[in-house]
UniProtKB/Swiss-Prot annotation:
Known pathway: Cofactor biosynthesis; NAD(+) biosynthesis; NAD(+) from deamido-NAD(+) (ammonia route): step 1/1
Subunit structure: Homodimer.
Superkingdom as given in the UniProt entry: Bacteria
Species for this entry: Mycoplasma genitalium (strain ATCC 33530 / DSM 19775 / NCTC 10195 / G37) (Mycoplasmoides genitalium)
Protein name according to UniProt: NH(3)-dependent NAD(+) synthetase
HAMAP family: NadE_ammonia_dep (MF_00193)
Coiled-coil portions: none
Ligand binding (ATP): 30-37, 134, 163, 185
Enzyme class name: ligase
Length: 248
């Protein structure tokens, strides 16, 4: 834990310096009621103070637990937050596109993530803030995020932290138990949880990535398949290798 707290302080100093050099006023991020966004919020508040951090709580068919978790987070942690109702915008968009969220729930879920991204960047530009992502090392390694959705950010503070490290920081910051004990979820569709969707637990993934666990052939296939499907998420848009001579 001592090394983790040392890393945290180095991270906070780096964040502060980077934002200052960027001539931004502060940082903005989505607050979902999950443990990753809660830890990012705690880091942001401690680093930049109340006025220069902003948590957007974006409502799109959120669960009752989402409401309870975000409410308790804001009340206990005293985050600077704004509630944004996006449900009407989401419903209008999927209707315009002819998408039924109950049938094509994955497409609809990714639209939710991208609508939140649009909202974050609109507020970021309005207030001269930089956008903080909430993804951890496991999610980035497997590509478990929505391209141009929750994967879009200016700074990814948790990018080198395992899920177990995020839990340790949550304890360090005294994050409410309702957040720590709930099943990790991106809240993309009803009943969705990260571990059910991936087919493997964060504990297994943490141990595997540290080299402390040899996965079964079935679990190895899950990890390799997830990484292969998400490879494009880690790359810039592909360009045709043959250069066009535009001078002729």
């Amino acid at each position: 834990m001592t090394n983790l707290i040392k890393y945290l302080k180095e991270l906070q100093n780096w964040l502060f310096d980077y934002v200052k050099k960027s001539k931004a006023k502060g940082v903005i991020f989505g607050l979902s009621g999950g443990i990753d966004s809660a830890v990012v919020a705690a880091i942001a508040k401690e680093t930049f103070g109340f006025e220069n951090h902003l948590a957007l709580i974006m409502h799109i068919n959120n669960s009752k637990l989402d409401f309870q978790a975000t409410s308790e987070l804001v009340k206990k942690m005293q985050f600077n937050s704004i509630n944004i109702e996006l449900e009407e915008s989401f419903n209008l968009l999927v209707k315009t596109l002819g998408i039924d969220p109950k049938k094509d729930f994955l497409t609809a879920g990714n639209i939710k993530a991208r609508l939140r991204m649009i909202t974050l960047y609109a507020y970021a530009q309005k207030h001269n803030f930089l956008v903080l992502g909430t993804g951890n090392f496991v999610e980035y390694t497997l590509g478990y995020f929505t391209k141009w959705g929750d994967g879009a950010c200016d700074i990814a503070p948790l990018a080198w932290l395992l899920k177990e490290d995020v839990y340790k920081l949550a304890k360090h910051f005294n994050i409410p138990e309702i957040v720590i004990t709930r099943a990790p979820t991106a809240s993309l569709f009803e009943g969705q949880t990260d571990e059910t969707e991936m087919g493997i637990t964060y504990k297994e993934l943490d141990q595997y990535l540290k080299g402390d666990l040899i996965l079964s052939s079935e679990k190895q296939k899950i990890v390799l398949d997830l990484k292969a499907k998400a490879e494009h998420k880690h790359n810039s848009p592909l360009k045709f290798k043959h250069l066009y001579n535009f001078q002729n």
